[in-house]
Amino acid sequence: MPSGEKTPSPCGYSPFQVGESIRKGNYIRQIMTITLLQQDTLWMDWKANLSKATQAIRRAPGSDLYLLPEMFTTAFLTVPPPQSAYIHDHALDWMRQQADEAHAAICGSMVAPMPHGKYANRMYFVCPDGTIHHYDKSHLYKYGGEGEWYVPGEQRVIVDYRGAKILLEICYDLQFPMWCRNNVDSTGNILYDVIVYSANYPTARHQAFETLPIARAIENQCYVAIANRIGSDQWGTYYGGSRIIHPYGDIIAQGTDNAECEVTGTIDLPALHRYRKKYPVLQDIIWNKFF
């Protein structure tokens, strides 16, 4: 299995602090609601992008998790601008505020400054109680120049949120199945229940984007939620195709192509656990035959 994996970290939930936990929006869910924000991400107009995202969250109240596309503040940047740190700090403050007001987690990627003039394509998962988790994109799209300025992440990150274990992934990671491979740990527990992807997949890669998320759901016996952008920029056009996918491979909810929309669906954790118990295929992975 991939090395450098962080132990699933909880979003502030403690069974001994139930009253405080419920007040801050941290509690165990049997059925979890996820909303994908499929947006036309405007080039370098971070204020407008955050304003649109705020309105989208207001139009879809009551979700446990709101998922945004890749680099939702600026659109996809291969060369980070000088004001990247300023944009990053304001955007992260915005995520904290939205998580608190919506009593839900807010998740999406943006440019994050690193030491020595480098950057990360960083996905933040901000919980209602203010807890922040992050994952740095591991597979950089070198064909598009992403590898010049960005530092690849070296660890997978799994967040334990309202009873669901959620693996954080970004766009191009989708094409590397071993990086997101699910497994059974030493205590017999399956590592994660849901993969969330912030994406910036172009229309030219339509077939891959339609196929790969379904494959990831089936092979890992998990739900997949993937938020993609629409619109166009200097790199091409984007059609959306944001979806929530069942472990069987069925589509639970899907956005309208080439339209801004909020895509909401539910995931059933008890049903997932029953399915895995009935068909325990993850126990049959033979790692030493390949690694």
Predicted region positions:
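CN hydrolase (nitrilase-like) catalytic-core segments centered on the catalytic cysteine
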Residues: H90-C107, L174-C261
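Active-site catalytic loop in hydrolytic enzyme cores
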Residues: M114-I190, A204-T211, R274-V281, F291
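Polybasic, lysine-rich low-complexity intrinsically disordered segments
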Residues: K6-T7, K24
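Short beta-strand scaffold segments in enzyme catalytic cores
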Residues: G108-M110, R122-F125, V157, S242-I244, ...
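Cys-nucleophile CN-hydrolase/nitrilase-fold catalytic domain and related Cys-dependent amidase chemistry
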Residues: W46, S51, Q55-P128, H133-H134, ...
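Extreme N-terminal starter segment of soluble prokaryotic enzymes
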Residues: Q30-L36
